[in-house]
């Protein structure tokens, strides 16, 4: 994945970056409810999870700061595009990681996502493929309606955004 090094000394958020970087637990999270009525209609017979994943990853990539990662040498890189790495559940209830690389049209993304899921469900593991630092880590817990999930982070320098959602509900 291609990225550009950001000069944090000249970045308008330099102070905030330094402040949070010095913390032992520098992570912040936000929980929002999203109306997916239009998406449910527009997706037709296409898979719900991959349709929502496509929309979420497009939205996250539209925010440059969400594409920024801290490199091992402490520099900050802004990726041109960040793909999702998400969990897929095998028939035995064990989950594995699946990745769909690249910025692509909706129909292509759905087909590629289905292909990759078949592949990882046959032989997948908890090992990530590709440039792990570029990923958005995505989890879905579709049998539980929840308002927050706090996924684990490897270290304080782990700067991959985590995105999750639970069971969707109908609200009148």
Where are these regions (language model features)?
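Flexible, Gly/Pro-enriched loop and linker segments at secondary-structure and domain junctions
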Residues: 1-33, 49, 135-139, 144-172
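Acyl-group handling in specialized metabolite and lipid biosynthesis
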Residues: 28-44, 95-108
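Long, contiguous hydrophobic alpha-helical segments, chiefly transmembrane helices and signal peptides
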Residues: 30-32, 53, 60, 66, ...
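Acyl activation and transfer enzymes in specialized metabolism, enriched
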Residues: 40-64, 172
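Short, solvent-exposed polar/charged micro-motifs at secondary-structure junctions
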Residues: 40-41, 77-81, 146-150
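Small-residue-rich loop/turn and linker elements
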Residues: 66-99, 128
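A short, structural micro-pattern
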Residues: 78-80, 130-132, 157-159
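Helical lid/core segments from catalytic subdomains that handle acyl or acyl-like groups
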Residues: 90-148
């Amino acid at each position: 994945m291609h990225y550009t090094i950001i000069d944090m000394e000249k970045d308008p958020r330099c102070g905030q970056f330094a402040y949070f970087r010095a913390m032992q637990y520098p992570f912040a999270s936000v929980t929002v409810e999203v109306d997916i009525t239009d998406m449910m209609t527009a997706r037709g017979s296409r898979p719900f999870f991959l349709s929502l994943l496509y929309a979420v990853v497009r939205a996250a990539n539209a925010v440059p700061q969400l594409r920024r990662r801290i490199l091992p040498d402490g520099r900050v890189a802004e990726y041109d595009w960040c793909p999702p790495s998400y969990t897929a559940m095998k028939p035995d209830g064990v989950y594995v990681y699946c990745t769909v690389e690249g910025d692509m049209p909706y129909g292509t993304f759905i087909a590629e996502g289905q292909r990759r899921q078949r592949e990882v469900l046959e032989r997948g593991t908890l090992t990530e493929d590709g440039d792990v630092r570029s990923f958005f880590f995505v989890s879905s817990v579709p049998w539980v309606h929840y308002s927050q999930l706090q996924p684990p982070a490897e270290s304080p320098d782990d700067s991959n955004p985590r995105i999750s959602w639970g069971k969707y509900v109908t609200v009148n």
